[in-house]
UniProtKB/Swiss-Prot annotation:
<keyword id="KW-0132">Cell division</keyword>
<protein>
    <recommendedName>
        <fullName>Probable GTP-binding protein EngB</fullName>
    </recommendedName>
</protein>
<keyword id="KW-0342">GTP-binding</keyword>
<dbReference type="GO" id="GO:0046872">
    <property type="term" value="F:metal ion binding"/>
</dbReference>
<feature type="binding site">
    <location>
        <begin position="60"/>
        <end position="64"/>
    </location>
    <ligand>
        <name>GTP</name>
    </ligand>
</feature>
<dbReference type="GO" id="GO:0005829">
    <property type="term" value="C:cytosol"/>
</dbReference>
<comment type="similarity">
    <text>Belongs to the TRAFAC class TrmE-Era-EngA-EngB-Septin-like GTPase superfamily. EngB GTPase family.</text>
</comment>
<dbReference type="GO" id="GO:0000917">
    <property type="term" value="P:division septum assembly"/>
</dbReference>
<dbReference type="GO" id="GO:0005525">
    <property type="term" value="F:GTP binding"/>
</dbReference>
<dbReference type="InterPro" id="IPR019987">
    <property type="entry name" value="GTP-bd_ribosome_bio_YsxC"/>
</dbReference>
<dbReference type="InterPro" id="IPR030393">
    <property type="entry name" value="G_ENGB_dom"/>
</dbReference>
<dbReference type="InterPro" id="IPR027417">
    <property type="entry name" value="P-loop_NTPase"/>
</dbReference>
<feature type="binding site">
    <location>
        <begin position="33"/>
        <end position="40"/>
    </location>
    <ligand>
        <name>GTP</name>
    </ligand>
</feature>
<feature type="binding site">
    <location>
        <begin position="178"/>
        <end position="180"/>
    </location>
    <ligand>
        <name>GTP</name>
    </ligand>
</feature>
<feature type="binding site">
    <location>
        <begin position="145"/>
        <end position="148"/>
    </location>
    <ligand>
        <name>GTP</name>
    </ligand>
</feature>
<keyword id="KW-0460">Magnesium</keyword>
<keyword id="KW-0131">Cell cycle</keyword>
Length: 200
C-alpha cells in the first residue's frame, strides 16, 4: 500500500478570489465538483482526517477556495462546489468566473481531480470544467464518487461510459470509481497524486 503523505495536510487559508491565493509556485492539485458530489468527504477520506474539509448537508455551502498545505511546496486546493439550484444566479456566475480564472491562470496547478456522482456523471458544468482544463492541456482525473450506492457491474459500466466519452483525450483524462464510505479507490488516487506532486 502506498504511504499516505496526505494525512499530514493542514488548513492553510481560504480565498474568495484568485488574487488572494498564496504565491503561484510549487505544486497544487485542485479538487472540483458539483455541490453534493462528495468532494469534502473524498478529501477527508484521502487525508484520513474527517474534520479537514467541512461536509455539509446544504449543497453550495463551500463558496471559498480552501487551501491545505502538505509541505512548503505542495498544496491541496478545494474549489467551490458548483451547480446548486438554490444559489442566486449572480453568486453562481461569480463562482464560475473564479473557477475559470483559477484553472486558466494558476501556473503551479499540476492537475484537476473532478468529482462526479457515479449515478449522474457528465453534467453540463462538469463537461465545461473538463474543457477548460483540456484547453490548457491540464491533466484531469475523474473520480466517480458514491460507488457504494450502485452494484459493482453498474459502477464498472459508469466508469466505461465516462472513459469512452473522453477517449479522444485519454492522454489527459483518466477515470476511476471511488467510495469515501468504503474507502474504495483511495490507493489508486494516492498513486496518481504522488505522480502529480512528484514526491521524491
Amino acid at each position: 500500500m502506498p504511504i499516505n503523505l496526505y494525512s499530514k495536510a493542514v488548513f492553510l487559508k481560504s480565498a474568495a478570489r484568485v488574487n488572494q491565493l498564496p504565491e503561484d509556485s510549487g505544486y497544487e492539485v485542485a479538487f472540483a465538483g458539483r455541490s453534493n458530489a462528495g468532494k469534502s468527504s473524498a478529501l477527508n477520506c484521502l487525508t484520513n482526517n474527517k474534520n479537514l474539509a467541512r461536509t455539509s448537508k446544504t449543497p453550495g455551502r463551500t463558496q471559498l477556495i480552501n487551501l491545505f498545505s502538505l509541505d512548503e511546496q505542495r498544496r491541496l486546493v478545494d474549489l467551490p462546489g458548483y451547480g446548486y439550484a438554490k444559489v442566486a444566479m449572480e453568486v453562481k456566475l461569480e463562482w464560475q468566473k473564479n473557477l475559470a480564472h483559477y484553472l486558466e491562470a494558476r501556473q503551479c496547478l499540476r492537475g484537476l481531480i473532478l468529482l462526479m456522482d457515479v449515478r449522474h456523471p457528465l453534467k453540463d458544468l462538469d463537461q465545461i470544467l473538463v474543457n477548460w482544463a483540456l484547453h490548457r492541456e491540464l491533466p484531469v482525473h475523474i473520480l466517480l464518487t458514491k460507488a457504494d450506492k450502485l452494484s459493482r457491474s453498474e459502477v464498472k459500466n459508469a466508469v466505461l461510459k465516462v472513459r469512452q466519452y473522453y477517449e479522444l483525450a485519454e492522454h489527459l483524462v483518466s477515470v476511476q470509481a471511488f467510495s469515501s464510505v468504503k474507502k474504495d479507490g483511495v490507493e489508486e488516487l494516492i498513486s496518481l497524486l504522488d505522480r502529480w506532486y512528484e514526491w521524491n
